UniProtKB/Swiss-Prot annotation:
Pfam families: PcrB (PF01884). Its main location: cytoplasm. It comes from Haloquadratum walsbyi (strain DSM 16790 / HBSQ001). It catalyses: sn-glycerol 1-phosphate + (2E,6E,10E)-geranylgeranyl diphosphate = sn-3-O-(geranylgeranyl)glycerol 1-phosphate + diphosphate. This is Geranylgeranylglyceryl phosphate synthase. Its EC number is 2.5.1.41. GO terms for biological process: glycerophospholipid biosynthetic process. Sn-glycerol 1-phosphate binds at K13, Y162, I163, E164, Y165, S166, G167, G192, G212, D213.
Length: 239
């Protein structure tokens, strides 16, 4: 499992539906020290909004990926390094496990498979928009999370396992359980990373932390603190 994400400590997720902090630019965003930018969101996303962010970020030397929330908002652009497509392993609705993906292939025909990978989401915050939209069963123990991670890696060959707590800082025991269950896949974590300390704490368990709302709420300096936190955790041998 040798995708570029195996080398990432930090991913910055840009929501096309949310503005940057006043006075900040996408050049500033690309200078935060993050390893890659992922463009995506759950609500009110359109192709036009996606394209605007792709165009703005593509001017800078930064790995750039789209995370499409549904097939209708996929942007076909050579400026993108690729597509990271969520599949929600604990979704109650089959549409978010494979149905949306089937529709994408049916509508658009052969995809750019060389640039397309999936993220095996395990959604654990019941109050998050993604949990509501996908009807995720978020009532999972640490053992459940470890089992989902194992199934995603071993049975389905997923290269990225993504523990999603969007909107709140997650249970480190559950993230640690997922990490212990994996042997090759890269473990992403997203949710509630608000500064150096939280990035360091979760960096002790996850291979890669994903920061999103912080960019839009507090700005690029706050994001840079999270970059430092996770990189220090990994340098200190926490993972």
């Amino acid at each position: 499992m040798n995708g570029p994400w195996t080398e990432w400590d930090h991913v910055l997720k840009v929501d096309p539906d949310k503005p940057l902090v006043d006075g900040e630019t996408f050049e500033d965003v690309c200078q935060t020290g993050t390893d890659a930018i992922e463009i995506g969101g759950t609500l009110d996303i359109t192709t036009e909004k996606m394209q605007e962010v792709v165009d703005a970020c593509s001017r800078y030397d930064m790995p750039l990926y789209q995370e499409p929330s549904n097939p209708a908002v996929v942007v076909e652009s050579d400026a993108l390094d690729g597509y990271l497509v969520p599949t929600v392993f604990n979704a109650e609705s089959a549409f978010w496990v494979a149905g949306a993906h089937k529709e994408w292939v049916r509508i658009d025909g052969p995809l750019d498979w060389e640039r397309t990978a999936t993220e095996a989401y395990i959604v654990l915050n019941p109050d998050a928009s993604v949990a509501e939209v996908t009807e995720a069963n978020t009532d999972q123990t640490a053992e459940d999370v470890a089992a989902f991670a194992t199934v995603a890696e071993r049975l389905f060959g997923q290269e990225i396992i993504y523990i999603e707590y969007s909107g709140t800082f997650g249970d480190t025991k559950k993230v640690a359980a997922a990490a212990a269950a994996l042997t090759e896949s890269t473990l992403f974590y997203g949710g509630g990373i608000g500064g150096y300390d939280s990035a360091y704490e979760m960096g002790a368990h996850a291979d890669t932390i994903v920061v999103g709302d912080l960019l839009h709420d507090e700005g690029v300096d706050a994001v840079s603190e999270t970059v430092a936190g996770v990189k220090d955790a990994h340098a200190d041998g926490e993972i």
